[in-house]
């Protein structure tokens, strides 16, 4: 991919980020109006209360962290269906090693994260070296991680007994917002923001980030340009393991108890956040801030549906429709862009032909 093409795509990323942002603001505004008119008329709408907005960020932080790892994997042209069960494994292994095996907390956390990196690296090696479809390998990984996690804890849940409360407890004194709700600001929110900034910086400003885009856009062209495509793909899965491990620890801090369902179906939310945030399923396109907004939008939709007292089943319907809508919208936008480029190229060719004819005359 040429530098000009890369710059053009990055310009479209910014436009895509604005679109997600405006959809987020529009959704919050609609829920707020409905709440003011029909649910709680005459009172401050909880949807826009500082406490509720912070709760949305709290709810999506772990998913958003994991989505940053998925961002790099998908930009490089891959996908990972195993992140949900890998999350359960990391949570269960951490809790089991700390509570039952008496590991120091730091050792338990580091060991669990390193295992996540190892497992993801193994899948990345198979995908990059043996040319196996990521969908198949990560689907197998999902099943394998589930089985290993169940074996470790014998299908039981394990409580952390508040050992991770330092990541969960609010860093500010109790303060009530206009809706009378207490504002909670746990530290793992800042972990989410910090990882987003790091991934954004790596993708935007480093040679490694440019290689990820190049591999995702056209692996063959990247190879001919001297990029080690296999190592780039392998490294994105290894980094994904690291980031998923961190996200799993943050999630464990929030829920306190590790169980096999801790990460169940988490991959749906992670992939949805990435796709809504502008990551192309075909690779080579997207950025971290778009995914950041996509994760928050997913959380806002779930939160808004709870405020409207809709059944939880409708949340799955909404998530599925959102993913389908995001993919269709991206495909339509890409087709329109390709058509405009083709028309511009044809116009340029005609103008050059007319100029050559005048010179000959």
Regions found by a protein language model. Name each.
Residues 21-36, 70, 113, 146-147, ...:
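Hydrophobic core segments of alpha-helical transmembrane domains in multi-pass membrane transport
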Residues 103-109, 118-123, 127, 175-258:
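Helix-loop-helix "hairpin" substructures at the membrane interface of multi-pass membrane proteins
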Residues 134-208, 232-235, 255-260, 341-361:
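Transmembrane helix-bundle core of multi-pass membrane transporters
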Residues 1-33, 37, 217, 224-231, ...:
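Cytosolic-side transmembrane-helix boundaries in multi-pass membrane proteins
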Residues 29-36, 49-101, 126-132, 274, ...:
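Single transmembrane alpha-helix segments in multi-pass membrane proteins
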Residues 244, 254-320:
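Transmembrane alpha-helical segments in multi-pass inner-membrane proteins
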Residues 102-143, 293:
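Alpha-helical transmembrane segments within multi-pass membrane transporters and channels
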Residues 26-45, 76, 152, 200-207:
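Structural signal for alpha-helical transmembrane segments and their membrane-water exit/capping regions
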């Amino acid at each position: 991919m040429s530098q000009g093409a890369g710059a053009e795509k990055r310009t479209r990323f910014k436009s895509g980020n604005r679109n997600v942002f405006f959809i987020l603001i529009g959704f919050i505004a609609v829920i707020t109006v409905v709440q003011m008119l029909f649910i709680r008329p005459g009172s401050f709408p909880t949807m826009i209360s500082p406490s509720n907005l912070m709760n949305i960020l709290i709810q999506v932080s772990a998913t958003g962290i994991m989505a940053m790892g998925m961002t790099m994997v998908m930009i490089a042209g891959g996908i990972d269906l195993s992140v949900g069960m890998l999350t359960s494994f990391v949570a269960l292994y951490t809790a089991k090693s700390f509570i039952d095996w008496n590991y120091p907390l730091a050792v338990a956390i580091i060991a669990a994260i390193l295992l996540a990196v190892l497992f993801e690296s193994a899948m990345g090696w198979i995908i990059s070296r043996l040319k196996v479809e990521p969908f198949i390998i990560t689907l197998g990984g999902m099943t394998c991680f589930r089985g290993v996690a169940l074996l470790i804890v014998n299908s039981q849940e394990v409580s952390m007994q508040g050992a991770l409360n330092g990541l969960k407890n609010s860093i500010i004194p109790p303060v009530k917002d206009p809706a009378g709700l207490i504002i909670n600001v746990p530290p793992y929110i800042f972990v989410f923001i910090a990882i987003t900034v790091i991934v954004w910086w790596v993708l935007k400003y480093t040679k490694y980030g440019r290689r990820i885009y190049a591999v995702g856009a056209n692996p063959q062209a990247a190879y001919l340009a001297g990029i080690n495509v296999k190592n780039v793909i392998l490294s994105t899965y290894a980094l994904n393991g690291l980031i998923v491990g961190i996200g799993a620890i943050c999630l464990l801090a929030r829920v306190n108890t590790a169980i096999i369902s801790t990460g169940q179906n988490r991959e749906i939310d992670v992939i949805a956040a990435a796709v809504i945030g502008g990551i192309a399923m075909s690779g080579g396109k997207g950025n971290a801030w778009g995914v950041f907004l996509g994760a928050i939008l997913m959380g806002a939709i779930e939160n808004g549906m709870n405020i409207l007292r809709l059944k939880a089943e409708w949340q799955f319907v909404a998530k599925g429709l959102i993913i389908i809508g995001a993919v269709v919208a991206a495909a339509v936008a890409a087709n329109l862009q390709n058509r405009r480029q083709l028309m511009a190229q044809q116009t340029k060719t005609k103008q050059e032909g007319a100029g050559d004819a005048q010179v000959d005359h």
